[in-house]
Curated annotation (Swiss-Prot):
Record Gene3D superfamilies: P-loop containing nucleotide triphosphate hydrolases
Lineage: Bacteria, Pseudomonadati, Pseudomonadota, Gammaproteobacteria, Enterobacterales
Swiss-Prot/TrEMBL induction comment: By DNA damage, as part of the SOS response, repressed by LexA. Induced 8-fold by hydroxyurea (at protein level).
Family note: Belongs to the SulA family.
Subunit structure of this chain's protein: Interacts with FtsZ.
Renumbered residue ranges of the record's region Lon protease binding: 162-169
Organism: Escherichia coli (strain K12)
Protein name per the record: Cell division inhibitor SulA
Function noted in UniProt: Component of the SOS system and an inhibitor of cell division. Accumulation of SulA causes rapid cessation of cell division and the appearance of long, non-septate filaments. In the presence of GTP, binds a polymerization-competent form of FtsZ in a 1:1 ratio, thus inhibiting FtsZ polymerization and therefore preventing it from participating in the assembly of the Z ring. This mechanism prevents the premature segregation of damaged DNA to daughter cells during cell division. The effect of overexpression of SulA is neutralized by antitoxin CbeA (yeeU).
Domain of life: Bacteria
Length: 169
């Protein structure tokens, strides 16, 4: 798994985790949009990184919205992952052309602690700015999940994971 250049525009994953830690004490957080690029043949790596964050967000009174392209979340997986089944909503078979628009609308409402959407193509500057504004307005987090195949991964970048944090620099 590696993150794209867009992921570093608003924040890194480690700062997202620190924001979540503050949610428990302050009960407020600013909006965040982050892209997660992962290998399709290694979904466990993504789960290891995101599940603790999603479990923490599940303690809020707000919903978690999953905008999935084809697959449907299984109840068994949601429960086994420690996510609150009663707070997870899913819209599946959403056309990619509607994913960004749906994410913006959902983030803006403030009804969701996190909105997760799958996109195959890079965001435009305008789409990214619109998502950031919506996340800030709704005080929510948005994750753009971008799967890549193992063959395209080998041609794009050799390192598997890059997490930039000002804590280590």
């Amino acid at each position: 798994m590696y993150t794209s250049g867009y992921a570093h525009r608003s924040s890194s994953f480690s700062s997202a985790a620190s924001k979540i830690a503050r949610v428990s004490t302050e009960n407020t957080t600013a909006g965040l949009i982050s892209e997660v690029v992962y290998r399709e043949d290694q979904p466990m790596m993504t789960q290891l990184l995101l599940l603790p964050l999603l479990q923490q967000l599940g303690q809020q009174s707000r919903w978690q919205l999953w905008l999935t392209p084809q697959q449907k979340l299984s109840r068994e997986w949601v429960q086994a992952s420690g996510l609150p089944l009663t707070k997870v909503m899913q819209i599946s078979q959403l056309s990619p052309c509607h994913t960004v628009e749906s994410m913006v609308r959902a983030l803006r409402t403030g009804n969701y602690s996190v909105v997760i959407g799958w996109l195959a193509d890079d965001l435009t500057e305008e789409e990214h700015a619109e998502l950031v504004d919506a996340a800030n307005e709704g005080n929510a987090m948005g994750f753009i999940m971008r799967p890549v195949s193992a063959s395209s991964h080998a041609t794009r970048q050799l390192s598997g994971l890059k997490i930039h944090s000002n804590l280590y620099h």
